[in-house]
Amino acid sequence: MKTVTIITIIVVIIVVILIIMVLSKSCVSHFRNVGSLNSRDVNLKDDFSYANIDDPYNKPFVLNNLINPTKCQEIMQFANGKLFDSQVLSGTDKNIRNSQQMWISKNNPMVKPIFENICRQFNVPFDNAEDLQVVRYLPNQYYNEHHDSCCDSSKQCSEFIERGGQRILTVLIYLNNEFSDGHTYFPNLNQKFKPKTGDALVFYPLANNSNKCHPYSLHAGMPVTSGEKWIANLWFRERKFS
């Protein structure tokens, strides 16, 4: 009788352990999924193309209250008067993107704590971050569908990659809400986002453990119909950004 009881207990323990293992794999959070971002360039082929749509991918999500409204105002005031026409990889093309932008050094005391916060939460090195890009959209301005990283073997892409590899993490902060429309739209997911002031939209340009752009990461800044839309982009590369 004692032997049967001991066997039953052992079986129950094994079943419980197996259940815990299954749940731990299926319930991995967004933050744990990016825990290895700082080493995801290991053993990857330099095949900068497109992943299949059914390849593994962590979908976009909103990170609430990343910065407070006072900090948002401070960034907008600092950027105002320093803006120039936004650019894409191939230069300035207003048929693709017709906003205004400027850059703030990631070492600027005004924004450095934001970067450090993201680095802690997502386990990415500070050195892998680009500078902060601040963007303003006026009425009827937009950014057509695009990927945040490189998806072909063009000269522009090669030069882009040389500066630290692919972009592997995008943190897009909405600095204000005083505008109409202007959502961030992911056509292949049929999802659009318009976070509140100080919230960040987080997404990954690449398929999991890959150098390839995932179709789900294709996105657009929809046209603003009234007011001014202000955002700030934090991008992190595979390696140290230069």
Swiss-Prot record:
Tell me where in this chain the Fe2OG dioxygenase domain is found. Answer: 128-238
Q: Where in the cell is it found?
A: Virion
Record carries keyword Transmembrane: no
Under the heading Pfam families, the entry gives: 2OG-FeII_Oxy_3 (PF13640)
Cellular-component GO terms for this entry: virion component
* Swiss-Prot/TrEMBL keywords: Dioxygenase, Iron, Metal-binding, Oxidoreductase, Virion, Vitamin C
What protein is this chain from?
Putative prolyl 4-hydroxylase
Report the Gene3D superfamilies cross-referenced here. Answer: q2cbj1_9rhob like domain
User: Any keyword Oxidoreductase?
Assistant: yes
- EC? 1.14.11.2
Role played: May catalyze the post-translational formation of 4-hydroxyproline in -Xaa-Pro-Gly- sequences in the 6 collagen-like proteins of Mimivirus.
Matching SMART domains, A to Z? P4Hc
Primary localisation category: virion
Which cofactors does this gene product need? Fe cation; L-ascorbate
Class of this enzyme:
oxidoreductase
Write one Gene Ontology MF term: L-ascorbic acid binding
Q: Which domain of life is it from?
A: Viruses
Record-linked InterPro entries: Oxoglu/Fe-dep_dioxygenase_dom (IPR005123), P4HA-like (IPR045054), Pro_4_hyd_alph (IPR006620), Pro_4_hyd_alph_FE2OG_OXY (IPR044862)
Q: Which family does it belong to?
A: Belongs to the P4HA family.
Can you state which reaction this protein catalyses? L-prolyl-[collagen] + 2-oxoglutarate + O2 = trans-4-hydroxy-L-prolyl-[collagen] + succinate + CO2
